[in-house]
């Protein structure tokens, strides 16, 4: 019996140690009540909320009673560009201290930059990071393609307003990236639109339909939006780079590439829906602040 204990008990202890040592360290540190990245990727859970936030960041829009998007809309449109071109009139002149009267204060320009660039970046980056970890996951790359199109929609306004922005190094992890010239930004955007359209043309089913506030996951419409943006940008650069313009105009109008937006049924827009109840951001300034009117 003594010999049995001497031989068997140490063997059992060694076996237990080997079993414990062979445990996957990742499993040990994984919460039993949380979810893994793999589980988040199933059904697009990893991207859903970020995609909805990203789409809403291009033109600020929120739920009824939420004042944040209304305040942002004032800075972006109502008392700035929209006021200047005559789309809106205002009951408050803010001491003539707004862009509508050619007064560009540092404070307001900082807010504008944050809205046009920063808010888009905050929602795009999580999608970019998550999809970069799943390069072999077709759905992840399709979602990233959709996100990159939205990013271009948002950042196109940023570069048109401020010129140099960080684009080619965005999402690279570089904490001190050098802003790109507008020429490089446009080239990068055109390349991203072409790549995104190519990925989404191959989609055989809807992409993130539960969280897509624009097209409900219809990949063919996203392709048309990408090509339409490509066409718009290519026409803009015609006098600066005729060869680049010619190349991308041809690509955008090539029917085999998915076409462009030609009917209102294909226009990109976000509205109130069962998916996410929303209210027009201008209503805050019109009804609650009583500061803005049309024309």
Predicted regions and their residues:
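Bacterial N-terminal signal peptides that target proteins for export
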Residues: 2-10
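Core hydrophobic alpha-helical transmembrane segments of single-pass membrane proteins
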Residues: 13-14
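Membrane-proximal, proline-rich intrinsically disordered regions
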Residues: 23-86, 133-134
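Structured, solvent-exposed acidic/aromatic patches
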Residues: 41-45, 90-295
């Amino acid at each position: 019996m003594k010999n049995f204990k001497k031989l068997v008990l140490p063997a059992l202890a060694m076996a237990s140690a080997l079993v414990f040592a062979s445990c996957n360290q990742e499993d040990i540190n994984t919460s039993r009540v949380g979810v893994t990245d793999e589980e988040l990727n199933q059904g697009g859970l990893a991207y859903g909320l970020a995609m909805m936030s990203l789409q809403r960041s291009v033109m600020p829009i929120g739920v009824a009673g939420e004042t944040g998007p209304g305040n942002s809309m004032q800075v972006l449109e109502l008392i700035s560009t929209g006021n200047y071109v005559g789309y809106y009139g205002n009951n408050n002149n803010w001491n003539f201290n707004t862009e509508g009267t050619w007064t560009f204060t540092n404070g307001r320009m900082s807010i504008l930059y944050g809205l046009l660039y920063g808010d888009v970046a905050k929602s795009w980056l999580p999608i970019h990071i998550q999809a970069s970890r799943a390069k072999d996951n077709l759905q992840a790359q399709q979602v990233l393609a959709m996100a990159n199109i939205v990013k271009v929609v948002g950042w196109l306004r940023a570069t048109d307003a401020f010129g140099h922005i960080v684009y080619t190094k965005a999402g690279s992890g570089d904490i001190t990236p050098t802003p790109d010239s507008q020429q490089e930004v446009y080239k990068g955007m055109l390349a991203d639109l072409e790549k995104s359209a190519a990925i989404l043309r191959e989609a055989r089913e809807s992409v993130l339909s539960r969280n897509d506030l624009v097209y409900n996951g219809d990949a063919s419409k996203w392709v048309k939006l990408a090509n339409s943006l490509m066409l718009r940008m290519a026409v803009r650069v015609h006098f600066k780079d005729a060869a680049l313009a010619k190349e991308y105009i041809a690509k955008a109008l090539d029917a085999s590439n998915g076409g462009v937006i030609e009917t209102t049924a294909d226009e990109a827009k976000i509205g109130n829906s069962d998916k996410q109840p929303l209210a027009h951001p201008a209503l805050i300034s019109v009804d609650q602040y009583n500061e803005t009117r049309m024309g």
